[in-house]
Regions:
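Transmembrane alpha-helix/interfacial motif
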Residues: 60-81
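Inner-leaflet juxtamembrane helices
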Residues: 77-95, 187-191, 195, 287-309
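Short intracellular "coupling" helices and adjacent cytoplasmic loop segments at the cytosolic face
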Residues: 77-82, 88, 99-103, 204-219, ...
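C-terminal transmembrane module of eukaryotic multi-pass membrane proteins
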Residues: 186, 242, 264-268, 274, ...
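Helix-loop-helix junctions within predominantly alpha-helical proteins
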Residues: 2-65, 97-190, 196-219, 243, ...
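Hydrophobic alpha-helical transmembrane segments of multi-pass membrane transport/permease proteins
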Residues: 131, 249-256
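Short amphipathic alpha-helical coupling elements at transmembrane boundaries
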Residues: 90-97, 196, 200-203, 207, ...
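Intracellular effector-coupling site of seven-transmembrane GPCRs
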Residues: 216-251, 322, 327-329
Length: 370
């Protein structure tokens, strides 16, 4: 079974390979910023421009929204890696101060590693679904004579230009696959790490119940220091993904709404039907990864306060221990929430609300089209 450090190295390698990491070679950064980013921005402009020619064609409008949400996934992840590069590096460095999984025995460590492996496999499933979507889009553009590009956008009549745009779209979609793997893996690993550290912290507090006064006091100081470290890492992680959460919320509503509309109200080819189904599942999995993990941390942080109460601080005669416990309890009682732009609370309830909203909007669009 891999060590806990292997999971961190996995993230570092992906960020390095994106060309936007602190250790990425200059030529990779040049390719990412001076070639791939302008291509993505150009394709976004062509998609937005094509809205002028929808002419009340609801299917074309839906496909353009799908294209726009797809490029939104690319640009927001580039934004994170470019703007929050230093904060990401700080988080990765702080991760080195986390407690080892083996702190409370090898059996407990193996359980924690399985938690991490499960989370990473969920990310791999997400990347696999995105890859399937890209293949479906490319297949659809080949088999459907009416489609000249994988993603709907404004297309000139010139065949040579169409070939160039096709190549650009394929390059962008390959980059989307890689960046989803990179950014989402970083988030999943760090959130799961924070959750695991809260589990270790609770285990440490349980072990202090039978300790002598001096040993208990030293243990409490260690717990408080580690708790403050986790709060700091969580705050930085929320800072990195705050804009992403907000954009992802609306992009996911948009993407789910479009796919639900296509599935419910439009007769499409087998390729388009398959693509819509995979796309919808991918959106569900992707949003679940972000919202569920944030909610897990929130719940673990709430349970920490109960563990502090169970240390039986009221019966101790040492005022230093009581003071340390009260200080830690005050911090633990503050809700540890993830927020998107200070507006969207990232948790399970909001996850359900998101898809209810998408379903409602798609139903309204269907009623309007009829």
């Amino acid at each position: 079974m891999p060590s806990d450090q292997d999971f961190l190295d996995f993230c570092r390698k992906l960020i390095h390979g994106s060309g936007l990491g602190p250790t990425s070679p200059s030529y990779m950064r040049l390719i990412s910023l001076c070639i791939l980013l302008p291509i993505a921005l150009l394709m976004d402009c062509l998609i937005i421009y094509d809205f002028v020619y929808t002419k009340n064609d609801i299917f074309k409008f839906a496909e353009l929204l799908e294209s726009l949400s797809s490029y939104g996934q690319l640009l927001i992840r580039k934004f994170i890696l470019i703007v929050h590069e230093k904060v990401i590096q700080e988080v990765l460095e702080l991760r080195k101060n986390f407690w080892k999984y083996e702190t409370f025995g090898e059996e407990h460590a193996n359980y924690l590693r399985r938690e991490m492996i499960t989370a990473i496999r969920a990310t791999q499933i997400m990347v696999g679904l995105v890859t399937m979507i890209v293949l479906c889009l490319c297949l659809s553009s080949i088999t459907n004579k009416e489609k000249s590009l994988p993603l709907e956008s404004w297309t000139p009549e010139n065949e040579s230009v169409k070939c160039v745009l096709y190549t650009m779209q394929v390059m962008s979609m390959i980059e989307v696959i890689y960046l989803i793997g990179t950014v989402d893996s970083f988030y999943v690993v760090m959130c799961t790490e924070i959750k695991i550290q809260f589990l270790l912290l609770k285990e440490k507090l349980r072990s202090l119940r039978s300790k002598e006064t001096i040993e208990c006091l030293n243990g409490l100081k260690t717990c408080i220091k580690h708790h403050n470290l986790l709060l700091s890492v969580h705050k930085k992680l929320n800072r990195i993904f705050s804009e992403y959460f907000l954009v992802q919320y609306f992009v996911s509503v948009l993407a789910a709404c479009v796919q639900l509309y296509i599935l419910k109200y439009i007769t499409v080819s087998l390729e388009d039907l398959l693509k819509s189904l995979v796309y919808l599942v991918a959106v569900f999995v992707q949003v679940a990864l972000f919202f569920m993990l944030a909610s897990d941390i929130e719940e673990e942080a709430e349970q920490l306060a109960d563990e502090i109460y169970d240390v039986d601080w009221e019966s101790t005669s040492d005022p230093k221990i009581r003071k340390q416990l009260l200080f830690m309890l005050m911090r633990a009682q503050e809700p540890l929430c993830m927020w998107g732009g200070g507006m969207v609370h990232i948790n399970r309830n909001e996850y359900i609300v998101l898809f209810r909203l998408a379903f409602s909007v798609s139903t309204l669009l269907g009623a309007k089209a009829e």
